[in-house]
Amino acid sequence: MKAPSTSANLGAGFDIVAVAHDAYFAEAYTAVGSGCGVHVKFKGYDPGPENTVTRSFKKFFELTGICRGVEVEVENNIPIARGLGSSGAAAVAALAAFIREAGIKTDPRAVIEAAGYGETAAAGSPHFDNVAGAALGGAVVLTSLSPIDYVKFSPRLIFVVGVPEVPPMPNKTKVMREVLPKSVEFKTYVRQTARVASLIAGLALSDPRLVARGMEDEVVEAARAPYVPGYARVRKYAFEAGALGVSLSGAGPSVIALVNEKEAEAVRDAVLRAYAEEGLRAEVKIASITEGALASL
Protein backbone atom coordinates (compact mmCIF):
# COMPACT_ATOMS: atom_id res chain seq x y z
CA MET A 1 0.00 0.00 0.00
CA LYS A 2 1.10 3.54 -0.73
CA ALA A 3 0.59 6.71 1.30
CA PRO A 4 1.40 10.12 -0.18
CA SER A 5 3.52 12.99 0.99
CA THR A 6 1.55 15.74 2.70
CA SER A 7 1.90 19.42 3.44
CA ALA A 8 0.35 20.47 6.73
CA ASN A 9 -0.80 23.92 7.81
CA LEU A 10 -0.75 25.45 4.32
CA GLY A 11 -0.26 28.83 5.93
CA ALA A 12 -2.96 29.78 8.40
CA GLY A 13 -4.35 26.26 8.95
CA PHE A 14 -1.91 25.41 11.73
CA ASP A 15 -2.38 21.86 13.08
CA ILE A 16 -5.79 21.38 11.41
CA VAL A 17 -5.22 21.45 7.61
CA ALA A 18 -3.21 19.16 5.35
CA VAL A 19 -3.13 18.43 1.64
CA ALA A 20 -1.99 15.13 0.14
CA HIS A 21 0.08 15.40 -3.04
CA ASP A 22 1.88 13.11 -5.43
CA ALA A 23 5.38 14.53 -4.96
CA TYR A 24 6.50 11.42 -3.04
CA PHE A 25 5.10 8.20 -1.59
CA ALA A 26 5.79 5.76 1.24
CA GLU A 27 5.08 2.08 0.61
CA ALA A 28 4.44 -0.72 3.08
CA TYR A 29 3.96 -4.47 2.82
CA THR A 30 2.58 -6.72 5.53
CA ALA A 31 2.30 -10.42 6.31
CA VAL A 32 -0.31 -11.38 8.89
CA GLY A 33 0.12 -14.48 11.02
CA SER A 34 -0.82 -15.91 14.39
CA GLY A 35 -0.16 -14.32 17.73
CA CYS A 36 -0.28 -10.67 18.69
CA GLY A 37 2.46 -8.14 17.99
CA VAL A 38 4.31 -6.29 15.28
CA HIS A 39 7.80 -6.44 13.83
CA VAL A 40 8.84 -3.63 11.51
CA LYS A 41 11.70 -3.51 9.02
CA PHE A 42 12.62 -0.29 7.21
CA LYS A 43 14.34 -0.56 3.85
CA GLY A 44 17.49 1.54 3.74
CA TYR A 45 17.52 2.87 7.30
CA ASP A 46 16.79 1.90 10.90
CA PRO A 47 14.86 4.37 13.09
CA GLY A 48 15.10 2.06 16.09
CA PRO A 49 12.55 -0.13 17.87
CA GLU A 50 10.35 2.74 19.10
CA ASN A 51 9.42 4.14 15.71
CA THR A 52 6.21 5.69 14.40
CA VAL A 53 5.01 2.50 12.72
CA THR A 54 5.45 0.29 15.79
CA ARG A 55 3.74 2.81 18.06
CA SER A 56 0.92 3.27 15.57
CA PHE A 57 0.21 -0.47 15.49
CA LYS A 58 0.21 -0.72 19.28
CA LYS A 59 -2.27 2.15 19.48
CA PHE A 60 -4.41 0.69 16.67
CA PHE A 61 -4.61 -2.66 18.47
CA GLU A 62 -5.61 -0.83 21.66
CA LEU A 63 -8.29 1.29 19.94
CA THR A 64 -9.89 -1.49 17.91
CA GLY A 65 -9.43 -4.53 20.12
CA ILE A 66 -7.91 -6.26 17.08
CA CYS A 67 -4.48 -7.81 17.48
CA ARG A 68 -2.63 -10.06 15.07
CA GLY A 69 0.95 -11.08 14.49
CA VAL A 70 2.19 -8.68 11.81
CA GLU A 71 5.44 -8.45 9.87
CA VAL A 72 5.84 -5.04 8.22
CA GLU A 73 8.33 -3.83 5.64
CA VAL A 74 8.44 -0.10 4.88
CA GLU A 75 10.06 1.61 1.91
CA ASN A 76 9.80 5.33 2.53
CA ASN A 77 10.63 7.49 -0.48
CA ILE A 78 9.44 10.69 1.20
CA PRO A 79 12.39 12.84 2.33
CA ILE A 80 12.76 12.51 6.08
CA ALA A 81 12.53 15.51 8.43
CA ARG A 82 11.63 17.85 5.60
CA GLY A 83 8.07 18.83 6.57
CA LEU A 84 6.43 16.40 4.13
CA GLY A 85 4.86 13.97 6.59
CA SER A 86 7.29 11.12 5.98
CA SER A 87 6.92 9.43 9.37
CA GLY A 88 3.14 9.71 9.35
CA ALA A 89 2.87 8.41 5.79
CA ALA A 90 4.95 5.35 6.70
CA ALA A 91 2.61 4.56 9.58
CA VAL A 92 -0.52 5.10 7.50
CA ALA A 93 0.77 2.96 4.63
CA ALA A 94 1.61 0.15 7.06
CA LEU A 95 -1.76 0.27 8.81
CA ALA A 96 -3.59 0.35 5.46
CA ALA A 97 -1.58 -2.66 4.24
CA PHE A 98 -2.44 -4.55 7.42
CA ILE A 99 -6.15 -3.72 7.16
CA ARG A 100 -6.24 -4.98 3.59
CA GLU A 101 -4.18 -8.10 4.28
CA ALA A 102 -6.18 -9.02 7.39
CA GLY A 103 -9.50 -8.33 5.69
CA ILE A 104 -10.84 -6.21 8.52
CA LYS A 105 -13.16 -3.23 8.56
CA THR A 106 -12.42 -0.16 10.62
CA ASP A 107 -13.31 3.50 10.92
CA PRO A 108 -10.74 5.81 9.25
CA ARG A 109 -10.70 7.77 12.50
CA ALA A 110 -9.03 4.82 14.22
CA VAL A 111 -6.24 4.88 11.63
CA ILE A 112 -5.82 8.64 12.00
CA GLU A 113 -5.79 8.48 15.79
CA ALA A 114 -3.35 5.56 15.87
CA ALA A 115 -0.95 7.04 13.31
CA GLY A 116 -1.21 10.46 14.96
CA TYR A 117 -0.27 8.88 18.27
CA GLY A 118 2.61 7.14 16.52
CA GLU A 119 4.04 10.57 15.75
CA THR A 120 5.12 10.76 19.39
CA ALA A 121 8.12 8.66 18.33
CA ALA A 122 9.24 11.35 15.87
CA ALA A 123 7.90 14.58 17.37
CA GLY A 124 7.41 13.89 21.07
CA SER A 125 3.65 14.50 20.96
CA PRO A 126 0.69 13.35 18.84
CA HIS A 127 -0.01 15.16 15.54
CA PHE A 128 -2.99 14.35 13.36
CA ASP A 129 -2.90 16.74 10.39
CA ASN A 130 -0.30 14.96 8.22
CA VAL A 131 -1.59 11.48 8.99
CA ALA A 132 -5.16 12.51 8.17
CA GLY A 133 -3.99 13.76 4.79
CA ALA A 134 -1.96 10.61 4.11
CA ALA A 135 -4.88 8.38 5.07
CA LEU A 136 -7.74 10.20 3.38
CA GLY A 137 -6.06 12.10 0.55
CA GLY A 138 -7.31 15.33 -0.94
CA ALA A 139 -7.46 18.26 1.46
CA VAL A 140 -8.39 17.42 5.04
CA VAL A 141 -9.61 19.82 7.71
CA LEU A 142 -9.67 18.50 11.26
CA THR A 143 -12.85 19.74 12.94
CA SER A 144 -12.09 18.09 16.29
CA LEU A 145 -8.92 16.68 17.83
CA SER A 146 -10.60 14.85 20.71
CA PRO A 147 -12.43 12.88 19.49
CA ILE A 148 -10.92 12.91 16.01
CA ASP A 149 -13.26 14.24 13.34
CA TYR A 150 -12.72 15.80 9.95
CA VAL A 151 -14.07 16.95 6.63
CA LYS A 152 -12.38 16.03 3.37
CA PHE A 153 -12.41 18.01 0.16
CA SER A 154 -11.08 17.09 -3.28
CA PRO A 155 -9.93 20.37 -4.82
CA ARG A 156 -8.14 20.44 -8.15
CA LEU A 157 -4.96 22.27 -7.22
CA ILE A 158 -1.39 22.29 -8.50
CA PHE A 159 1.64 22.94 -6.33
CA VAL A 160 5.36 23.39 -6.64
CA VAL A 161 7.15 21.63 -3.78
CA GLY A 162 10.72 22.64 -2.98
CA VAL A 163 12.86 20.35 -0.82
CA PRO A 164 16.27 21.79 0.12
CA GLU A 165 19.21 19.58 1.02
CA VAL A 166 20.06 20.93 4.45
CA PRO A 167 21.33 19.13 7.56
CA PRO A 168 18.39 17.82 9.60
CA MET A 169 17.57 19.90 12.64
CA PRO A 170 17.64 17.72 15.80
CA ASN A 171 14.15 17.47 17.34
CA LYS A 172 12.89 19.73 14.56
CA THR A 173 9.17 19.61 15.34
CA LYS A 174 9.74 20.24 19.03
CA VAL A 175 12.16 23.11 18.35
CA MET A 176 9.89 24.71 15.76
CA ARG A 177 7.03 24.66 18.25
CA GLU A 178 9.10 26.25 20.96
CA VAL A 179 9.70 29.35 18.80
CA LEU A 180 5.96 30.02 18.44
CA PRO A 181 4.40 32.96 20.29
CA LYS A 182 2.50 32.14 23.47
CA SER A 183 -0.15 34.77 22.71
CA VAL A 184 -1.21 37.15 19.93
CA GLU A 185 -2.98 40.50 19.88
CA PHE A 186 -6.73 40.42 19.33
CA LYS A 187 -6.48 42.24 15.98
CA THR A 188 -3.95 39.65 14.80
CA TYR A 189 -6.31 36.89 15.91
CA VAL A 190 -9.14 38.38 13.84
CA ARG A 191 -6.95 38.67 10.73
CA GLN A 192 -5.70 35.14 11.19
CA THR A 193 -9.23 33.79 11.63
CA ALA A 194 -10.23 35.43 8.35
CA ARG A 195 -7.31 33.69 6.64
CA VAL A 196 -8.29 30.30 8.06
CA ALA A 197 -11.84 30.86 6.82
CA SER A 198 -10.53 31.78 3.37
CA LEU A 199 -8.26 28.72 3.28
CA ILE A 200 -11.02 26.28 4.18
CA ALA A 201 -13.55 27.91 1.86
CA GLY A 202 -11.02 27.80 -0.96
CA LEU A 203 -10.33 24.11 -0.41
CA ALA A 204 -14.05 23.36 -0.28
CA LEU A 205 -14.79 25.36 -3.44
CA SER A 206 -11.56 24.46 -5.27
CA ASP A 207 -10.87 28.20 -5.54
CA PRO A 208 -7.11 28.89 -5.79
CA ARG A 209 -7.51 32.60 -5.02
CA LEU A 210 -9.19 31.90 -1.69
CA VAL A 211 -6.65 29.20 -0.85
CA ALA A 212 -3.82 31.61 -1.65
CA ARG A 213 -5.24 34.23 0.70
CA GLY A 214 -5.34 31.62 3.45
CA MET A 215 -1.70 30.72 2.85
CA GLU A 216 -0.65 34.05 4.35
CA ASP A 217 0.28 33.61 8.01
CA GLU A 218 1.60 36.27 10.36
CA VAL A 219 1.69 34.08 13.46
CA VAL A 220 3.25 30.63 13.06
CA GLU A 221 5.13 31.10 9.81
CA ALA A 222 6.42 34.51 10.85
CA ALA A 223 8.03 32.88 13.89
CA ARG A 224 9.47 29.94 11.97
CA ALA A 225 10.67 31.56 8.75
CA PRO A 226 13.99 32.85 10.16
CA TYR A 227 15.00 29.25 10.93
CA VAL A 228 14.36 27.98 7.38
CA PRO A 229 17.38 28.28 5.03
CA GLY A 230 16.64 30.23 1.86
CA TYR A 231 12.95 30.71 2.57
CA ALA A 232 12.77 34.47 2.05
CA ARG A 233 14.43 34.27 -1.38
CA VAL A 234 12.41 31.22 -2.44
CA ARG A 235 9.18 32.96 -1.48
CA LYS A 236 10.14 36.15 -3.31
CA TYR A 237 11.20 34.38 -6.51
CA ALA A 238 8.14 32.13 -6.52
CA PHE A 239 5.77 35.08 -6.35
CA GLU A 240 7.69 36.93 -9.03
CA ALA A 241 7.32 33.89 -11.31
CA GLY A 242 3.56 33.79 -10.83
CA ALA A 243 2.86 31.74 -7.71
CA LEU A 244 -0.53 32.45 -6.14
CA GLY A 245 0.47 31.52 -2.61
CA VAL A 246 3.60 30.31 -0.82
CA SER A 247 4.06 28.76 2.61
CA LEU A 248 6.23 26.39 4.55
CA SER A 249 5.28 22.74 4.23
CA GLY A 250 4.61 21.77 7.82
CA ALA A 251 7.46 23.02 9.98
CA GLY A 252 9.78 23.19 6.95
CA PRO A 253 12.36 23.32 5.57
CA SER A 254 10.35 22.32 2.48
CA VAL A 255 8.28 24.98 0.77
CA ILE A 256 4.97 24.63 -1.07
CA ALA A 257 3.72 27.10 -3.67
CA LEU A 258 0.21 27.14 -5.12
CA VAL A 259 0.30 27.75 -8.87
CA ASN A 260 -1.82 27.86 -11.98
CA GLU A 261 -0.91 25.17 -14.48
CA LYS A 262 0.52 27.61 -17.01
CA GLU A 263 2.94 29.10 -14.44
CA ALA A 264 3.97 25.81 -12.83
CA GLU A 265 7.23 25.29 -14.73
CA ALA A 266 8.26 28.93 -14.39
CA VAL A 267 7.70 28.81 -10.63
CA ARG A 268 9.58 25.52 -10.35
CA ASP A 269 12.55 27.03 -12.21
CA ALA A 270 12.42 30.17 -10.07
CA VAL A 271 12.45 28.14 -6.86
CA LEU A 272 15.43 26.12 -8.10
CA ARG A 273 17.24 29.34 -8.95
CA ALA A 274 16.51 30.80 -5.53
CA TYR A 275 17.96 27.79 -3.76
CA ALA A 276 21.01 27.84 -6.05
CA GLU A 277 21.64 31.50 -5.24
CA GLU A 278 21.46 30.59 -1.55
CA GLY A 279 24.12 27.94 -2.16
CA LEU A 280 21.68 25.10 -1.54
CA ARG A 281 20.95 22.00 -3.55
CA ALA A 282 17.27 21.19 -3.80
CA GLU A 283 14.74 18.94 -5.46
CA VAL A 284 11.75 20.87 -6.78
CA LYS A 285 8.67 19.09 -8.10
CA ILE A 286 5.35 20.00 -9.64
CA ALA A 287 2.69 18.10 -7.70
CA SER A 288 -1.06 17.61 -7.70
CA ILE A 289 -3.61 16.66 -5.06
CA THR A 290 -3.85 12.88 -4.76
CA GLU A 291 -5.79 10.17 -2.93
CA GLY A 292 -4.79 8.67 0.40
CA ALA A 293 -3.88 5.15 1.46
CA LEU A 294 -7.39 4.26 2.59
CA ALA A 295 -9.02 5.19 -0.71
CA SER A 296 -8.69 1.69 -2.17
CA LEU A 297 -9.99 -0.15 0.92
From Swiss-Prot:
Keyword entries, A-Z: Amino-acid biosynthesis, ATP-binding, Cytoplasm, Kinase, Nucleotide-binding, Threonine biosynthesis, Transferase
Top-level enzyme category: transferase
UniProt KW Nucleotide-binding keyword: yes
Superkingdom of origin organism: Archaea
Binding site residues for ATP: P79, I80, A81, R82, G83, L84, G85, S86, S87, G88, A89
Family: Belongs to the GHMP kinase family. Homoserine kinase subfamily.
Record's function text: Catalyzes the ATP-dependent phosphorylation of L-homoserine to L-homoserine phosphate.
Name recorded for this polypeptide: Homoserine kinase
Species of the source: Pyrobaculum aerophilum (strain ATCC 51768 / DSM 7523 / JCM 9630 / CIP 104966 / NBRC 100827 / IM2)
